[in-house]
Design a protein with these regions (language model features):
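Interdomain hinge/lid region at the active-site interface
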Residues: 166
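Gly/Gly-Pro-rich "capping" loops immediately C-terminal to redox-active cysteine motifs
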Residues: 44-75, 80-86, 119, 131-160
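Extracytoplasmic/secreted proteins, especially bacterial periplasmic and envelope-associated proteins
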Residues: 31, 35, 61-64, 78-81, ...
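Cleavable N-terminal signal peptides
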Residues: 12-13, 23-24
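C-terminal capping alpha-helices of c-type cytochrome domains
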Residues: 84-106, 150, 173-183
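Bacterial N-terminal signal peptides that target proteins for export
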Residues: 2-11
């Protein structure tokens, strides 16, 4: 019984390709997330104050945010254009990846007076939805604790100006906030 070289070659090739497909499938989430690293840092741990940390955000929050960017309903400098370049499947892959990353706190200078005022504002206006000091990773309302202060201020200014969609219960709370409380 002779060995068919074509059949053997096909078998070896298919085994190799199956292995390569597995490697690519395992890396695809990380590779997709790396496309965000320029602004949002490696594994979603932002290195700069203009971009939020993505590490630990819930899948639904990430998906909803990217959908809003794609549809042009969330203000952005470039994210509206970037989001349009991803398929829904790619966005879901990135959402799963970032949700699985540990929450990373931005390195911000500590100002005791500002921290105290921020805690009071949080307790009064934010705690019902942004659980555990705003740091609950699975919270679909988004992570507040550990985000860059300039990014939080930009976001709150967008909410306050009506430039960004938000739940009605949040709109009621944001409307009551003074500019000083937002800072």
């Amino acid at each position: 019984m002779g060995c068919n070289k074509k059949a053997l070659g096909a078998l070896i090739g298919s085994v190799f390709m199956a292995g390569a497909t597995q490697v690519l499938a395992g890396s695809s989430a990380s590779m997709m997330a790396n496309t965000c690293a320029g602004c949002h840092g490696t594994n979603g741990q932002s290195a700069g104050p203009a971009s939020p940390n993505l590490a630990g955000v819930s899948e639904s929050y990430f998906n909803d945010s990217m959908k809003a960017f794609k549809e042009g309903t969330r203000p952005a400098t470039i994210m509206d254009r970037i989001a349009k370049g991803y398929s829904d499947e790619q966005i879901e892959t990135m959402a799963t990846f970032f949700a699985g990353q540990p929450v990373h706190k931005a390195m911000v200078p500590h100002d005791a007076a500002k921290a105290k005022a921020g805690a009071e504002t949080y307790d009064k206006s934010c705690a019902k939805c942004h659980d555990e000091g705003g740091s609950l990773p699975g919270d679909d309302a988004g992570i507040l604790a550990g985000q860059w202060l300039p990014w939080l201020e930009y976001s709150m200014a967008d909410f306050k100006a009506g430039n960004r969609e938000m739940p009605k219960k949040m709109a009621k709370q944001v409307e009551k906030l003074s500019d000083a409380e937002i800072e």
